């Protein structure tokens, strides 16, 4: 038994700003649906928190520390049954520079 797989595009988005990420996801889903492809998502992935601990004083006072954190938000969008028009429209899409995009076919 051989199962034929439908063509699928998986888009992984990553950004530090969640509002920028959400607007980018909306643009991608709208573009995919405009070209009659089936868009599944955006599926939120767990947010990664990086916490950095820094000494406030340059010399003494080891007890005085300051914490900084940076959060990276991630989303996945799957596009099923993409056509060549869908791929062309996604390539021409203008997204903000603060969003990291990874595309797999």
Curated annotation (Swiss-Prot):
GO terms for molecular function: structural constituent of ribosome; tRNA binding. The keyword Ribonucleoprotein applies. SUPFAM superfamilies: Ribosomal protein S10. One of its GO terms (cellular component) is chloroplast. Keywords: Chloroplast, Plastid, Ribonucleoprotein, Ribosomal protein. PROSITE patterns: RIBOSOMAL_S10 (PS00361). It is found in: Plastid, Chloroplast. One of its GO terms (biological process) is translation. Belongs to the universal ribosomal protein uS10 family. Involved in the binding of tRNA to the ribosomes. HAMAP family: Ribosomal_uS10 (MF_00508). Part of the 30S ribosomal subunit. This is Small ribosomal subunit protein uS10c.
